[in-house]
């Protein structure tokens, strides 16, 4: 018989840098998870993606065991890295802060494809372009 799910915990943690300190510790402590077990496993699984923020969905079962799924980094984080900026524009309709090429958008869309609700690469690229525009980025060919 399948284990009964008690709780889902969603977090965004820097790859390879999960620690028992807030915000990770309190979120997992409330769910009754072995915090050190999670942090060691997460850090081992994400060590190759250093510097990126990784969304993780932790499934907690009734017997306090858990498993987790790591997702691809958020599109905004990938866009900022591609453009080489710290943050997007506060007023994207007036102030443009950076430029990304369609090739960079395609690369990001290919990376994000498993997590996007897109039928093909073209629609995934349009989603990423929309995120870029809302951050005050200009898209060039």
Swiss-Prot record:
This is Large ribosomal subunit protein uL11. SUPFAM superfamilies: Ribosomal L11/L12e N-terminal domain, Ribosomal protein L11, C-terminal domain. Forms part of the ribosomal stalk which helps the ribosome interact with GTP-bound translation factors. The gene is rplK. One or more lysine residues are methylated. One of its GO terms (biological process) is translation. InterPro entries: Ribosomal_uL11, Ribosomal_uL11_bac-typ, Ribosomal_uL11_C, Ribosomal_uL11_C_sf, Ribosomal_uL11_CS, Ribosomal_uL11_N, Ribosomal_uL11_N_sf. Part of the ribosomal stalk of the 50S ribosomal subunit. Interacts with L10 and the large rRNA to form the base of the stalk. L10 forms an elongated spine to which L12 dimers bind in a sequential fashion forming a multimeric L10(L12)X complex. One of its GO terms (molecular function) is large ribosomal subunit rRNA binding. PANTHER family: 60S RIBOSOMAL PROTEIN L12, LARGE RIBOSOMAL SUBUNIT PROTEIN UL11M. Belongs to the universal ribosomal protein uL11 family. Pfam families: Ribosomal_L11, Ribosomal_L11_N.
């Amino acid at each position: 018989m399948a284990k009964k799910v008690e709780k889902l915990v969603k977090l965004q943690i820097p790859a390879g840098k999960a620690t028992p300190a807030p915000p990770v510790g309190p979120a997992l402590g409330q769910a009754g998870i072995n915090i050190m077990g999670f942090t060691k496993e997460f850090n081992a699984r994400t060590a190759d993606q250093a510097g990126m923020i990784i969304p993780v969905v932790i499934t907690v079962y009734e017997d306090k065991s858990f498993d987790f799924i790591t997702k691809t980094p958020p599109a905004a984080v990938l866009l900022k890295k591609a453009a080489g900026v710290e943050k997007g524009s506060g007023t994207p309709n007036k102030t443009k802060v950076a430029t990304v090429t369609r090739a960079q958008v395609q690369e990001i869309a290919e990376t994000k494809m498993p997590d996007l609700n897109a039928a093909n690469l073209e629609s995934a690229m349009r989603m990423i372009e929309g995120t870029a525009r809302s951050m005050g980025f200009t898209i060039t060919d």
